[in-house]
Design a protein with these regions (language model features):
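Aromatic-lined glycan-binding groove of carbohydrate-active enzymes
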Residues: 150-192
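Short acidic/histidine-rich active-site segments
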Residues: 230-236
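Active-site-proximal helices and loops of the catalytic beta/alpha 8
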Residues: 3, 58, 68-168, 220, ...
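Substrate-binding/active-site clefts of carbohydrate-active enzymes
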Residues: 1-65, 86, 92, 109
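Amphipathic alpha-helical
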Residues: 263-273, 277
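Carbohydrate-binding surface patches
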Residues: 258, 284-317
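The substrate-binding groove and active-site-proximal loops of carbohydrate-active enzymes
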Residues: 35-50, 67-77, 136-144, 198-209, ...
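C-terminal beta-strand-rich structural cap/linker in extracellular carbohydrate-active enzymes
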Residues: 322-349
Length: 349
């Protein structure tokens, strides 16, 4: 099956100690969740650690060839000391190289291997995928009270060290979760099978309302602390439940283009406004269907108002001026710190 050489067939292979061979396992070796194509390795085996983290090893080679960093898939299943050795290898090439981890919960309170994980204590990950923000934002645009959603957001902001918070990966859809529009506008799968999932497609009024809610969600994701990430296809409102429906090919002929200019402007604003990179988050109002917060930087201040209600609201800005925000819309106001110029407005109906 695997030829004459290799750790599977040759007990004297130098790679034999990397794996756990035993007849009790499917296929005769320990694999991830029983998938034979994903054999698990013993991360504490010195020769394996050296192969990955040593000079001239996997990490060293690819970073020196131009990679900017690594994302550790399922970081929960890697021992802390192995993650720390990976970090050492990454930073040995350059302090600017980045180590991101897939962690689904609050990374500062996560338990695994019967102990509290040390992801963000300065010796492990630089930052993590921000699933708590994703959940809070999607829940808010679906109807959760603003005060509850903002409490969840502030909890992460207070728990994470500033460098980790500023570089956290913020998103609404991933290859491991239902697409954002499906979460917002369709009903939960609740364990129903692939045949049911494959036939689902939101249309009509539910689709139009879902699009407005998705737009609000991305306005929040792009303006909160962290680095926004757009999962391919969200810009054309692709739908889909879990794998493989959330990983469908990109629809190059899609007629839905209304989100593109909004996302492009949010990305440009995030790039040009200093407050969105490292600015402090200040909440001015979080009540029912209204979120109103600031990002306060050294040079600029940005003020974000999201109106999930079905009526126009008049909101008082921090400057004392008032502004209208349309139903299912948002407004972003940017001004220089210490000055009183004309405000730069970004309004979305």
């Amino acid at each position: 099956r695997y030829g004459d050489g290799g750790a599977y067939r040759d007990p004297n292979s130098p790679y034999r100690s990397w794996y756990d061979f035993d007849s009790k396992y499917k296929g005769g070796y320990r694999s991830w969740w029983g998938f034979e194509t994903l054999p698990e390795v013993n991360e504490e085996t010195p020769s394996f650690v050296e192969f990955i983290t040593g000079e001239g090893g996997v990490i060293d080679t690819w970073l020196r060839r131009g990679a900017a960093g690594f994302r550790l898939d399922v970081a929960d299943e890697l021992p802390d000391d192995f993650i720390e050795k990976i970090r050492t290898a990454v930073k040995r090439v350059s302090p600017e190289k980045f180590l991101l981890g897939e962690v689904w919960e609050d990374a500062t309170t996560k338990f695994g291997f019967d102990k509290r994980r040390t992801y963000l204590l300065g010796k492990g990950l630089d930052s993590v995928m921000n699933y708590p923000f994703k959940n809070a934002v999607l829940d808010f645009v679906k109807g959760k009270p603003a005060e509850q959603a903002m409490t969840e957001i502030l909890t992460i902001c207070e728990h994470y060290p500033a460098p980790a918070m500023d570089t956290a990966l913020n998103f609404l859809s991933t290859h491991d979760t239902e697409r954002a529009l499906t979460v917002i506008a369709d009903e939960p799968a609740n364990g129903r099978g692939r045949a049911w999932q494959s036939g689902r497609c939101v249309t009509g009024d539910a689709y139009e309302e879902g699009l407005l809610r998705l737009r609000m969600a991305y306005a929040i994701i792009y303006t909160l602390p962290g680095v926004p990430c757009l999962y391919y296809g969200d810009e054309i409102a692709m739908q889909g439940y879990r794998d493989s429906f959330n990983r469908a090919f990109f629809r190059w002929d899609a007629h839905e283009q209304r989100l593109r200019p909004v996302l492009a402007q949010l990305a440009q604003l995030r790039h040009t406004c200093e407050a969105f990179r490292t600015g402090q988050l200040r909440v001015l109002r979080a009540e029912d269907g209204i979120l109103h917060y600031q990002r306060v930087g050294k040079v600029e201040t940005a003020e974000i108002i999201v109106n999930r209600t079905e009526h126009i609201i008049v909101e008082t800005l921090a400057s004392g001026k008032s502004t209208e925000v349309n139903p299912m819309g948002f407004t972003i106001v940017v001004e220089e710190v210490g000055h009183n110029p004309n405000h730069s407005y970004y309004d979305y109906v």
